[in-house]
Amino acid sequence: HFNDISKLKINIIGEPIIDRYEYCDVVGVTTKDPALSVLSKKVEMIGGGTLAAAKMAASFVKEVKLFTYGNEKTIKNLLGNRKNIKVINLAKNQKIQCKTRFINSNRGEKLIQSTNFDKNFFSKRDIQNSISKLIKNNPENLLVCDFGNGLFEDKLLNLINNLKTKKYLNVQTNSINLGFNLFTKYKNYSYLCLDTREWKLALKKNSLSKADIKKYIPKKGHV
């Protein structure tokens, strides 16, 4: 029931992303190269990745505790005026991945996407700091937003797998991490959110049956 949900306090851990949209008018092809020529009209910056998940959750639950990383001022600006989101910054020194999408302003079509870097690399100190903060807060439930940007590896991944708490997984495949960010690295989850391609990559199958997926459904969970 919605009234019950509105009283919930949830915990989210994941990688932040800046979704940058540059709207352009397509004016033709350049004269010296076979390249599309566009005229920039406006730019929008939106909090993506785990920031988007936190903003959506904050609109209908009592409190969101967000475990993420990056420049504090940038995170605050991207989250907007949401007083019920408490940020636990795991590594303030880490850059936030930015994905720029060039959009045909007349048709709304995406022309090309550019990403500023492929993944983050965390120092031993960053990892230990992240582990300490997660243990200290002892979350009763944990939504994991894994976009393959480097947070969920090695010791932190092992800790999450061993946490005695309900875990809800969103493990994303994209063009940069294709084939390298699979849900099979996780154990003991209560909920799993994947699309068809992500299932096929993880199970190494071109076609899927209900039986293929059934074995990965938790006894008291959902996919």
Label every PLM stretch briefly.
Residues 1-223:
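Ribokinase/PfkB-type carbohydrate-kinase core domain
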